[in-house]
Amino acid sequence: IEHGTITAVINGEPFEITTLRSDDKTDGRKAEVSFITNWKEDARRRDLTYNAMSIDFDGRLYDYFDGMNDLQNKVSKFVGDPEERIKEDYLRILRYFRFQSKIANPVWDEETIQAIKSNVLGLRKISAERIWQEVSKMLMGSNLDAILTYMNQTGVTGAIGLTTNNKEQLDRITYDHPVVGLAVLVSDSNISDRWKMSRGEKDLLHFLVTNKKTRLVQKTAEDMIIAGEDKAKLIALAQMQGLKQLADTLVQFQPPVFPVQGRDLLDKGMASGPSVGIALDKLKAIWKDSNYKLSKQQLLDKL
């Protein structure tokens, strides 16, 4: 509400509705705004020219800053003076690269690149959560080898603490989660704490980095899933290693359920206690050796 935005939920889908506004004061992170009625003035405060376009209910396009031409030329440009736009919110540097990753074979505007170089240290003012939010979206884009090359050259990766090892691999693999792309680039999972990633994201990154050099094969992956490993993690690992066919196979894989429970052993007269767990582990090993074929009764007969 403070910035003139509300979220309406229609049929379960959220839509942001924002009034026209102008930025009266900025500090490189957030702005003090006032509400206005001039569409062009509202568009002037946008970051990129094509993000400043709007369309009415009759399909008429309002393009005050030649955004459509920039899109057709596959180039991202800031509205007006790029240095001014960046200094209003330094996160716009990362947004620039994120939107470049959405364009096939993008063109690089030299004035924009120079403005980013001159203001890159401003990224240190940006919260870790906002940095990861933008980087995660960028990692789901394309042309990432080129994108990260320019981020290196402009000092962006250094400013946000991102290493770019094996960046050329990103354009050769397909993945469903941005953490997979991040795992390709980093050698440890420490960045997950710096960027304040969610617990699930941290767990996935740690798993992928830890197992990065372990070549995954179908039997091993299926055994791990049957033993209780999160199937989504194994799918992500296969995707990171460029094993698309294996990843697709694991998506369809339905693990068999170990047929014996502790109460089955108690019913056979075994005393409760540590011996039950030891016996279950022994039966699980036998079940695995049978390629998970033995039935409950066949396993119980092994006791």
Where are these regions (language model features)?
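Catalytic cores of the polymerase beta-like nucleotidyltransferase superfamily
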Residues: 1-303
